[in-house]
Regions:
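Non-heme di-metal
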Residues: 1-265
C-alpha cells in the first residue's frame, strides 16, 4: 500500500493511525491544509499501539464506581473508545477518497474532536491517581468497523451506531459518577456527550446522502454483519439528544423496540 504524499491531510491521517507513542496519539501535530488529488483507497488493517497500552481479547468490565480505581477503569475504557473513534475517522478518510470533500473534511474535524476527548479522559484518569495504560483494553471498534465496505455502512455503524449509543452511555455514567460524589468525572462525560450530538448529526446527514432518508430498516441492513441495533443503543434512550442529532421519533421508537426476534431480522 503506497503511503500518502507528505504535507497532506491524508498523510496526517496515515501517521495518526500508525502512531505508536502516547504523545502522538493524545497530542498529534495539527493537520496540513492540503489534500491529495486523486489518491487511491487505503484500508489500514490495524492501528499502531503505544507500548503502554495492553491490548486483550476481552477486557475486564467495570463493576462498582464507589472507589477511585473503579471510576478510573471506566474512564480508561471511555478513553480507548474515543481513541479508536479518532483513528477510525482517519481510517475512513483514507478508505473512501472518492467521497465528497465536505464529507472527508467532516471526518477530519470529528477525528480531532475525539482526540481532544481522549485528552479530557486522560486528565480525569490522572486526577484519580492512575495513568493511561493502567488497565487492559480491547480494540473492539477495530475488530468491527473496518468491515464496512461503503461510506454508507461506515456512517451507519459509527455516527448512527456507536456514537449514538454514546449519547446514552455518557449520560448514564455521568449520573453514576455524580451519585458517588465525583462531580469532575460527571462533567467530563457530560461535555463529551454534548459534543457527540454533532457527530451523530453528521452521521445522519451523510447516511441520507449516501443511502436514503433515515429509515430504521434501511439503517439496520446497512450495519456490517454481525452487528445489530442491540449494541447501538444504551438505556434509557436519550430521546432529546437523538432528536437534536436529527433522528426522528419513529426511528427512535423502532430502535427502542428492536429485538433479535423482531420479524424480518
Amino acid at each position: 500500500m503506497r503511503e500518502p504524499q507528505q504535507d497532506t491531510v491524508e498523510r496526517w491521517a496515515w501517521d495518526y493511525v500508525h502512531a505508536s507513542t502516547l504523545a502522538d496519539k493524545l497530542s498529534p501535530p495539527p493537520p496540513p491544509e492540503g489534500w491529495e488529488r486523486g489518491g487511491a483507497a487505503r484500508r489500514i488493517e490495524s492501528p499502531g499501539r503505544p507500548g503502554e497500552l495492553h491490548i486483550v481479547g476481552k477486557a475486564k468490565k467495570t463493576r462498582g464506581l464507589d472507589g477511585e480505581e473503579g471510576r478510573a477503569r471506566a474512564l480508561h475504557t471511555f478513553l480507548h473508545h474515543e481513541l479508536q473513534a479518532a483513528e477510525l475517522m482517519a481510517w475512513a478518510l483514507l478508505a473512501f477518497p472518492e467521497t465528497p470533500p465536505e464529507f472527508r473534511a467532516g471526518l477530519l474535524r470529528i477525528a480531532r474532536d475525539e482526540i481532544r476527548h481522549t485528552g479530557i479522559y486522560a486528565e480525569q484518569i490522572v486526577r484519580l491517581g492512575f495513568g493511561v495504560g493502567a488497565f487492559a483494553v480491547r480494540d473492539w471498534f477495530w475488530e468491527r468497523v473496518p468491515t464496512a465496505k461503503t461510506p454508507a455502512s461506515f456512517v451507519a455503524v459509527m455516527g448512527l451506531g456507536l456514537e449514538s449509543a454514546n449519547l446514552e452511555h455518557a449520560a448514564s455514567f455521568a449520573a453514576r459518577f455524580r451519585q458517588v460524589g465525583d462531580e469532575d468525572g460527571a462533567r467530563a462525560q457530560e461535555l463529551v456527550g454534548r459534543e457527540e450530538i454533532a457527530h451523530v448529526r453528521f452521521g445522519v446527514t451523510w447516511f441520507e446522502a449516501f443511502a436514503a432518508p433515515l429509515d430504521f430498516e434501511i439503517w439496520r441492513r446497512a450495519l456490517p454483519e454481525p452487528l445489530t441495533p442491540l449494541l447501538m443503543r444504551g438505556h434509557p434512550l436519550q430521546r432529546d439528544a437523538r432528536r437534536k442529532a436529527g433522528q426522528s421519533d419513529r426511528f427512535i421508537d423502532e430502535l427502542e423496540a428492536w429485538t433479535p426476534d423482531t420479524p424480518g431480522c
